[in-house]
Amino acid sequence: MRAAQDQRTIKRSDTGTIGTRGAGSFVRREPARLRRGGQGRPDVSGAGWHGARWTSVCVLASVLALAAAADAADQPQWGERYTRNMISAETGLPDSFDPATGKNIKWIAHLGGETHGTPVVAGGKVLVGTNNGDPRDGRHQGDRGVLMCFDEKDGKFLWQLVVPKIGGDPYLDWPSGGICSPPSVEGDRVYALSNRYEVMCLDLAGQANGNDGPYLDEGRHMAGRSGGAMAVTPIDADILWIFDLIKDAGIYPHDAAHASVLIDGPFLYVNTSNGVDNTHRKIRAPDAPALVVLEKATGRLVARDQEHLSPRTVHCTWSTPAMGEVNGRRLIFFGGPDGVVYAFEALKTMPPAGEVAKLNCVWRFDCDPEGVKENIHQYMGNRRQSASNIKGTPVFYKNRVYVAAGGDIWWGKELAWLKCIDASKTGDVTKTAEAWSYPVNLHCCATPSIAGGLVFITDLGRTIHCVDAETGKPCWTHKCRGEFWGSTLVADGKVYAGSRRGDFCILAADKEKKVLSSIDLDSPISSTPVAANGTIYISTQTRLYAVKKAAP
């Protein structure tokens, strides 16, 4: 089995050609279920603790200033640390590549049959969520959620987290959707969200250093409803703790779990994926939180929002939180499922055992104040009039928050905007904090990239937009073949983005549009490219590409 696994990595040879690709096949046809109008789902990117109080030796502003430099080599989470800006400090990145000839290809690894996860890179490993369409372990047959771990050097498969489906209603855990959430890595710990809505702490080494506790039931977890326990092997994940959002936070999930854990010292901030039921007209858990905070060491629930967002949830709670410091106060920025951006005061102290604190809301900004506010689910499927929601992540940059909001991709109006919000105000700032608003095409589930005074963002209108970060005035747009579910990456003076038609575009990150290259990849792209250690990583539906500029 190991030999077969190794053959699934396609390496660049000395002559620049591609060797055997082993099992599996390249897929060029976009599945009908995943075309626009179907029900496929997008990838919609600390200090020590002493006693009961986290003490910081410097203010968060200093940490944010140093974050890019400190994490420039690895890419251990969705976007830039804290701010979630979709940029990288990496240099020497390629402006073109060609899988057919091997040009600038470091390696290619096989994933499952459907991949919506964005890779993260940390500690010499690459992790990405996918499904079980191409099983690495013959014991696991059929639909599963999978988080795969590869060796950063050569793409060798190391270990995987395999999670059974919830079963029953497909709207709870969408068929073939796999694990969609990008994990977050700190040191030797991986914080991930499974397809069963479980926040997990994993050992980055997998089982290579033994099955660490306190959680020791990996075998039962893998077996799922089949009962009993499977043998834990060297290619299985090592789970340290689990927090079940359904059982322990009371959510009623919808479609697919999506969140990238925000790590802040001893705290983990996680959006909950609470949503509508299979009728798309009812919220089964109206009192469930939209945002929770867990204790990093144990997974204990320590805080939640108190904004009662769930009854106003248009579809589901998929936006990942960001963080920044404004006027000396650390704030958590959260894109609500009701189309409102919330700024919460970050926790300063750990609540006592058994206590669940309430997050303090500092300000709220309604991205669509003229949208439908009453009986919002009666407008499901209305492409002209509906409530708005937020699927991408708010980005904090120079005391401003940049975020995309608008009609739901599958059920809402065909209007969406990129908003720029002054983050320094308090209260309901809807009428006072908007710096500018820029309309995008159709719908948008992307997270912005902000660099060099410019903002770059994709949309479902097959367009990459470049606008002035200060004024919101358009600089240029670029049409690609497919709609975008993922976001742009800006790095080394270039803009990288891949579409649902499998075309991968590279442009200059400048006020004047310059197309550097367009590459035709094997299958649709739902994810966002990332950069780490001089390499670009791109996950398509079936492949993980490591793209690195060849030595002269």
Provide a role label for each language-model segment.
Residues 68-552:
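Noncatalytic, solvent-exposed loop/strand surfaces
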Residues 31, 39, 65, 69-71:
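Intrinsic disorder/low-complexity segments in short proteins, especially the signal peptide
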Residues 19, 53-54, 85:
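Residue-level detector of intrinsically disordered terminal segments
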Residues 52-67:
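Bacterial N-terminal signal peptides
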